[in-house]
Amino acid sequence: MKRNWKRINALFLAICLLFVSSFALAEGNPGNPPDGQPPQGQGGTPPEKPDGEAPGEPPAGDMGGGPGGSSQPDSYAAVQTVSEDTQLSGVTLDSVAADENALLVTAGNVQVTDSTLTRNSTDSTGGDSASFYGVGAAALVTGGTLKIRNSTITTDANGGAGVFAYGSGVATVADTTIDTTQDTSGGIHVAGGGTLYASNLTVITRGNSSAAIRSDRGGGTMVVDGGSYTSEGSGSPAVYVTADITISNAQLTATGSEALCLEGLNSVSLTDCQLSGNMADLSQNDNTWTVILYQSMSGDSEVGKGTFTMEGGSLTSLNGGLFYTTNTESEFTLRNVQITASDDCEYFLRCTGNQNQRGWGQSGQNGADCVFTAAQQEMNGNVIWDSISNLDLSLTEGTVFTGTVLDDESCAGNGGNGGCTLTIDESSSWVVTGNSVVTTLNCSGSIVDAEGRTVTIVDSNGNVLSEGESEYTITVNTLQSTAA
């Protein structure tokens, strides 16, 4: 019989290939993962930190981006790396390479006095690796402690932060001058859980995305006492908060951005500080603000309640409204703060959804849940809320609020079941300057117009609940007590 040798050879080759393949699988070749399990290895491992610019930090005021981006570096390049107890006095560390630290501390107790640290580079990367991990900072501590006193730190490089604390690193900086020039170059900076203490610093930043007091993904702790902190760039607030930050007796100035920006589950406390901002009117924003608490959805901060506390001192706004909260849960507490608003101030407080072009939540569903408490406070301007938000506004301890309360549904889509509750204690008053709308009014104090005339209160059907003499009317769903 005549054999078909081509067919026999093909069959033999197929059997061999099947045997080799089975052997490889038996040795542990992972192949494709089973359904419901992520692939392993470099190709399937997500970056440790997703991309996304910090709110209020990106150039031209771009507050927040999308996920994607860089992971933690395997190592850092530095002019001097220290990993044991060391004292450096009167030294000069000059870094000129791309993405290099002048001083890197990984362990030990390192003390730097009367020294100069500089970073000058035209080809540094900046961006996420600088913001999240301190790549290219003049001084970076990732472990141990770094103490800097009576020194000068100057950077002129993208990503050239002054002093950066990351991870378990702790930095203490006192009586020192920090001057940064290029973008993504905060003055003092924490991320990834770092800790930084600052006392009597003079800090100035000139680049975009370069808050004088800056934090980023992974947060941390900052305690600042005294000093002057000035940021000049666009998208560079004086203070950018994705950490827990406490500041006292400091001058905080932003000349080209909002004064302070807080995102997500973080907190800032200001005591006897002078805070000022001058944010530009930008087409990508649906309003302009001085202090913002929000959630950008960039992944830079854990979702949760942001807390802003300010006692004593002053707040100055050179453009736009004062306090804005959107797409988040937030809590504001003001006590005896001297507030100066711009001539074109749009509002004292805005608690609404947004139509921001960068996508802060889903339009029509991105309101805010806000508790705002004022004590011993003068408040002037409009309070704005919408039905996809919940605002609980309390006037306490002799607070005087002069303005209107308005329901603005322009960013509320199809609306919701939210509302505004206004509570006025027996020592406080509301001086009404226009027709107002409040969901629930609890008043043990005074409600009058600028001429001292009582204001009529009606329900949503127009029924008079409390007759007044003023031309203005307050519309409520619920009146818990009668205004005096």
Give the positions of each predicted feature.
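Extracellular beta-solenoid/beta-roll
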Residues: 341, 366, 370, 374-479
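Post-signal-peptide, soluble extracytosolic/periplasmic N-terminal scaffold domains
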Residues: 106-182, 189-200, 217
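Extracellular beta-strand/beta-solenoid scaffold signature
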Residues: 67-77, 97-104, 125-140, 157-164, ...
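A detector of tandemly repeated sequence units and domain arrays
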Residues: 33, 37-38, 45-49, 53-58, ...
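All-beta strand scaffolds that present successive hydrophobic residues in beta-strands
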Residues: 85-90, 109-115, 146-150, 170-176, ...
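Gram-positive cell-envelope targeting signals
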Residues: 1-42, 50-51, 103, 163, ...
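N-terminal segments that cap or nucleate solenoid repeat domains
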Residues: 64-125, 471-483
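Disordered, low-complexity segments in secreted/periplasmic proteins that are enriched in proline
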Residues: 26-74, 299, 358-363
